[in-house]
Every structure is written in C-alpha cells, then in structure tokens.
C-alpha cells in the first residue's frame, strides 16, 4: 500500500468522505472512458470535452516532440489528423487514481488498435502502454489537465499514422511548434 492509499484507507475516512472519494474516482474513470470512446467514434467534440482549456500534452513516444501546452480544440484537430482515416479501438485497464482535493493523478494502461486496409504492408498498428494523466475538478466535472502517453511496445505497421501527411504536419505544428 502506497502513501496515497494509506491516507484514504476505509478506517481513516468517515462514510461521507468515502462516498465522495468513490464518486470522484468513478468520475475520473468515466472521463478516461469518454476520452477513448471519443477517439474510437471519431467524435472530436466528445474527445475535446474531456480536456481542460488549456492543458499540457506529452506525446513524445508518438511524435518525438517535447511536451507542450495546447487547447482541446487544437489537440482534437491533431487527433483527427492522426486517426480520422483509421478504424481504432482503445481499451483501458489497471486504473490507479490518486486524489488530492480538486486535483488527481492517474495511471491507465491501454491497448490502442489502429487498422487501415492498404497495399503497403500490415493493415494494423497496435500500441501497448499507459497514460500518466493529471486531472482537475472544474465547474463541468473532472477533466484531464495533463496528458502523457507512454508506449511500452508497439507492433504492426506504424506508418498507418502517416506523419508525412501535410495535414498531420500542420496539426502537429499547431500543437508542438515547427519540427
């Protein structure tokens, strides 16, 4: 049991505080599930609604670029440039959430599957890893305030996410600055 876990053990919390903690954890879990569902449906409005404005993003493993601060709208345009032409499915597991009042941190394991039938190689690209996110309670509920995507490994055809596409280049530059 880590320090965060010990601080919120059932014996140390009154019933009302336990219910509040469980509610907050469920709301944060729901944010992550909407985040993934928005990606899978290519519902960029749903996806953007899971993020604070502005928020910090670290997608170094995908982009090779340093962390940046951006807006949900600009980030959703980047996600669309990466994924719009693909069939995708994001699965999350092993949720670990640490609450700190109106702030929270969480680690969420993911398997992200990407598929595009093509003539140039494998039709799939799968990423295995986790998100290390921070969250903030807002007037609209919990939202992601820091998004960090870490790959443990990948398999398949990484060129399905076409970083040479001018739309991808433009969207990446809007988030991270020029390459």
Regions found by a protein language model. Name each.
Residues 23-26, 79-83, 176:
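Generic secondary-structure transition motif, activating predominantly at the C-termini of alpha-helices
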Residues 2-16, 84-179:
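A beta-strand edge to alpha-helix "cap/lid" segment located at domain peripheries
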Residues 18, 22, 65, 69, ...:
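Charge-dense, low-complexity intrinsically disordered segments
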Residues 10, 17, 29, 60-61, ...:
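Generic, low-specificity signal for short hydrophobic/alpha-helical stretches with a mild N-terminal bias
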Residues 44-112:
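A solvent-exposed, acidic/Ser-Thr-rich amphipathic alpha-helical stretch
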């Amino acid at each position: 049991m880590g320090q965060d876990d010990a601080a919120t053990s059932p014996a140390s919390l009154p019933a009302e505080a336990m219910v509040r903690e469980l509610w907050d954890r469920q709301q944060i879990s729901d944010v992550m599930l909407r985040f993934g569902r928005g990606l899978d449906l290519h519902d960029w409005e749903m996806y953007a609604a899971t993020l604070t404005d502005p928020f910090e993003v670290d997608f170094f493993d995908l982009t090779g670029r340093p962390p940046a601060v951006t807006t949900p709208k600009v980030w959703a345009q980047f996600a669309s440039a990466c994924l719009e032409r693909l069939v995708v499915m994001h699965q999350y597991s092993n949720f670990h959430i640490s609450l700190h009042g109106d702030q929270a941190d969480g680690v969420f394991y993911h398997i992200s599957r990407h598929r595009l039938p093509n003539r140039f190689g494998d039709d799939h690209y799968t990423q295995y890893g986790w998100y290390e996110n921070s969250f903030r309670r807002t007037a609209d509920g919990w939202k992601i305030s820091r998004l960090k995507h870490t790959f443990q490994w990948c398999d398949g055809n990484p060129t399905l996410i076409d970083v040479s596409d001018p739309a991808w280049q433009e969207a990446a530059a809007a988030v991270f600055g020029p390459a």
